[in-house]
Amino acid sequence: MDVNVTSSTVRGTTRAPPSKSYTHRALLAAGYSDGATVRSPLVSADTKATARAVTAFGGAVEPESGERFDDADALVVDGFDGRPAVPDDVIDCANSGTTMRLVTAAAALADGTTVLTGDESLRSRPQGPLLEALGDLGVRAESTRGNGQAPLVVSGPLAGGEVAIPGNVSSQYVTALLMAGAVTEEGVEIDLTTPLKSAPYVDITLELLDDFGIEATPVGDGGDALDGAAGAAGFVVDGGQSYAPAGGSYTVPGDFSSISYLVAAGAVAAEPGEPVRIEGAVPSAQGDSAIVEIVERMGADIEWDREAGVITVRRSELSGVEVDVGDTPDLLPTIAALGAVADGDTRIMNCEHVRYKETDRVSAMAEELEKLGAKTTEEPDTLTVHGSESDLRGASVDGRADHRIVMALAVAALVAEGTTTIRGGEHVDVSFPNFFDAMADLGIAVERDGAGE
């Protein structure tokens, strides 16, 4: 689907979509339980892949009140109580890397063989460190092509034990092992061989596990317990635990990765004197809430009422800043788009791991912003956007089949002279299905071609 975005101003109130990261974890945690309700879930292409996996393991995921699955305000999960059945068929994770990694560890608990695959993009993403870790724990876990990429074959059962794993490729490996380790006989002790990147995503996992009654602990070099994942040398989760949220239900918070595009839109294109208000911005463990501090450093007029969960942002003159995205990789596209509008240089550092997402997001943003007239410099671990040298004009750009690239380019298109055509607009369904509807409600001039095809 092509989406045409014409230079526009925005105003009004919108609501953040529920968190994709929390929804994935909550659906699987409910699957590990003997039953739980997930309230305010994000129902998207990615999270539906996790729901299908829970069903494949012998659970069931249904809307609470008989509404359409896509419109569900709550999903009732009939769990498999920590003992996943061997699936009758291959588990297709579609485009969801989170699903594949979390479900690969869950598959290791089954007393038999599970096969997992995904779309072309997912079949190119690295799974090798997780497969090696499961192998070290006594599970057969292999790539059918021998390259550490899907399709994957996993044969359990997993009893638990101690394992070493790198922390600089994907924090999802840690999340997968912690979630599965809680229901093993022996528990799992994880030693990190390299410093942990994207630590806030593990904090999300630790927070959610606690809400489901699971104790998991980050530890330092001396084995002492830490308050959070940052700086951890490893993690410990005891086995034999049971997943059970208080009151039998769990409520998903708003998604700060998605909020970042709404904040950026307000910062660069709010109608003079008219703010953009974003509801549902309740504080949580999400590292991507750093977007508020980042745009404030750039000079944005922004306020965050944490108690009410409301962010208010007005258009301002922005200046370039330096940002380390080691812990917040999903913010890189948003920051790059802001940098193309700001005065001076915006230097995005510590971003090599962002190259291993749905696409190489570093190169993708550099190349697509260049099409719009931005000037960029790309290095292996750094992306610099030269805002003062940029003159954004409408052009045809490629969303690279990546939801975050599509949404970031839509933000840049708000201030590009004329009309910008973004190819692959349908991919927003991965994390923010009503993104273009929400933007249209704020006043963006948007037309969709082929939406019904």
Curated annotation (Swiss-Prot):
Chain residues that bind phosphoenolpyruvate: 20, 97, 125, 172, 361, 404
Grouped into one coarse class, the protein's main location is cytoplasm
Q: Can you tell which superkingdom this protein's organism belongs to?
A: Archaea
List the GO molecular function terms: 3-phosphoshikimate 1-carboxyvinyltransferase activity
Where in this protein does the record put region Disordered?
1-21
To which pathway does this protein belong?
Metabolic intermediate biosynthesis; chorismate biosynthesis
Q: Where does 3-phosphoshikimate bind?
A: 20-21, 25, 170-172, 198, 330, 357
Bias (Polar residues) = 1-12
Q: Which UniProt keywords apply?
A: Amino-acid biosynthesis, Aromatic amino acid biosynthesis, Cytoplasm, Transferase
Catalyzes what?
3-phosphoshikimate + phosphoenolpyruvate = 5-O-(1-carboxyvinyl)-3-phosphoshikimate + phosphate
Record: active site: 330 (proton acceptor)
| Location in the cell | Cytoplasm
> Is Cytoplasm there in the keyword field?
yes
Concerning PROSITE patterns, the annotation shows: EPSP_SYNTHASE_1, EPSP_SYNTHASE_2
According to the UniProt record, one GO cellular component term is: cytoplasm
Keyword Amino-acid biosynthesis (UniProt): yes
**EC annotation from Swiss-Prot or TrEMBL:** 2.5.1.19
Matches recorded under PANTHER family:
AROM/DEHYDROQUINATE SYNTHASE (PTHR21090), PENTAFUNCTIONAL AROM POLYPEPTIDE (PTHR21090:SF5)
Q: How does it assemble?
A: Monomer.
Q: Which family does it belong to?
A: Belongs to the EPSP synthase family.
User: Any idea what this protein is called?
Assistant: 3-phosphoshikimate 1-carboxyvinyltransferase
Which source organism?
A: Halorubrum lacusprofundi (strain ATCC 49239 / DSM 5036 / JCM 8891 / ACAM 34)
Gene it is expressed from: aroA
